[in-house]
């Protein structure tokens, strides 16, 4: 490299070095998770505020970590700053070394700890995917096995046939699919695809999901919530040149329209559940689906409420939908 070129690049190199030097130390990764269920009725529609706060406090370190790696990986996606990618990889590698979340899922009053691990895998696998092109072989050797162990631990939870494969199954599938994609693990990719397909197969002709219709006043909310990981999984499939949106004659479109119509007027949900629905503003899946829908204008009003952020879906969803989930093609 010539001296003039080196001098020209010096400010950029110094800025990146300074940013990486400023990367804060990650918190220690804990092996066990203790989360607390906070619904008081069988339908899962009535919240106990005290239990909800206890759960929020108990899981705050996990939520902060997820938000931090999402933010750092967003910085890389937005600016191509290698220091942001390296900080993300440093944090992921530290928790991999700690064996974070591979210990006991402590059952307090329900399976909330298992659900929390699923959401955390969603977050860390999506963050890793976003910075994958900056990971060197040594970093991949640290991080890949950890994510794969988490994914297989999450899948093992669903081996019990008594567990209801509702929105939690779809959210679990997202982390497994993202891990399969990021680590080039075909078995995990196929397992994630199976979770996606289960969600698509659950969609009725009227766009409803039977298990979410049983959620009383929160049925509309949980249709929106269940749709989010399905849309994100379809987006990950696009990175491999696959169109999962077309599955079962575009069944996902029926669900998306049912949710967006319900957010404007919940009368249909009120009638079919027998419960007045809590108000809903559609969540960040609209940032992607409005670009894929045959009638994207239906989702413009929801899009206008953005930008949308969700660490469990990867971070800044508006950024990811606009610029792509990854900067370079997957290896």
From Swiss-Prot:
User: Where is it mostly found?
Assistant: membrane
- S-diacylglycerol cysteine lipid sites: 23
What is the documented function of this protein? Polysaccharide lyase that catalyzes the depolymerization of several anionic polysaccharides via a beta-elimination mechanism. Exhibits broad substrate specificity, catalyzing the degradation of not only alginate and poly-beta-D-mannuronate (poly-ManA), but poly-beta-D-glucuronate (poly-GlcA or poly-GlcUA) and hyaluronate (HA) as well. The oligosaccharide products formed by enzymatic cleavage are comprised mainly of disaccharides, with a lower abundance of trimers and pentamers. Is not active on poly-D-galacturonate, heparin and heparin sulfate.
The protein's matches in PROSITE patterns, at most eight in alphabetical order, are given as: PROKAR_LIPOPROTEIN
Q: What is the effect of changing residue 221 to F?
A: Increases activity and specificity toward poly-ManA
Q: Name one GO molecular function term.
A: glucuronan lyase activity
Return the similarity comment: Belongs to the polysaccharide lyase 5 family.
> Has the keyword Repeat been applied to this entry?
no
**Disulfide linkage:** none
Keywords associated with the record = Carbohydrate metabolism, Cell outer membrane, Lipoprotein, Lyase, Membrane, Palmitate, Polysaccharide degradation, Signal
Query: Know the name of this protein?
Result: Polysaccharide lyase
Q: Is Membrane among the key words of this record?
A: yes
């Amino acid at each position: 490299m010539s001296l003039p070129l080196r001098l020209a690049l010096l400010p950029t190199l110094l800025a990146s070095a300074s940013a990486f030097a400023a990367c804060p130390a990650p918190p220690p990764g804990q092996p066990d998770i203790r989360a607390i269920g906070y619904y008081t009725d069988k339908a899962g529609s009535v919240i106990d505020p005290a239990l909800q706060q206890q759960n929020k406090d108990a899981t705050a370190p996990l939520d902060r970590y997820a938000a931090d790696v999402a933010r750092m990986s967003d910085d890389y996606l937005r600016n191509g700053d290698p220091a942001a990618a390296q900080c993300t990889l440093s944090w992921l590698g530290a928790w991999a070394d700690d064996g974070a979340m591979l210990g006991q899922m402590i059952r307090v009053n329900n399976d909330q700890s298992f659900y929390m691990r699923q959401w955390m895998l969603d977050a860390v696998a999506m963050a890793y995917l976003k910075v994958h092109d900056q990971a060197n072989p040594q970093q991949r050797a640290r991080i890949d096995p950890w994510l794969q162990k988490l994914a297989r631990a999450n899948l093992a939870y669903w081996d019990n046939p008594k567990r209801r494969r509702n929105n939690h199954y779809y959210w679990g599938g997202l982390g497994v699919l993202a891990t399969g994609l990021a680590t080039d693990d075909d078995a995990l990719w196929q397992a994630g695809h199976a979770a996606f397909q289960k969600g698509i197969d659950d969609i009725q002709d009227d766009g409803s999901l039977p298990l979410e219709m049983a959620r009383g006043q929160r049925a509309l909310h949980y249709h929106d919530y269940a749709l989010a990981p399905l849309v994100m999984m379809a987006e990950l499939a696009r990175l491999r040149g696959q169109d999962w949106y077309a599955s079962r004659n575009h069944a996902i479109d029926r669900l998306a329209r049912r949710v967006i119509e319900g957010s404007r007027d919940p009368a249909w949900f009120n009638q079919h559940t027998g419960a007045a629905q809590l108000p809903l503003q559609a969540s960040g899946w609209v940032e992607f689906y409005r670009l894929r829908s045959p009638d994207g204008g239906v989702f413009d009003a929801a899009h206008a409420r953005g930008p949308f952020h969700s660490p469990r879906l990867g971070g800044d969803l508006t950024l990811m939908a606009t610029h792509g989930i990854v900067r370079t093609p997957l290896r």
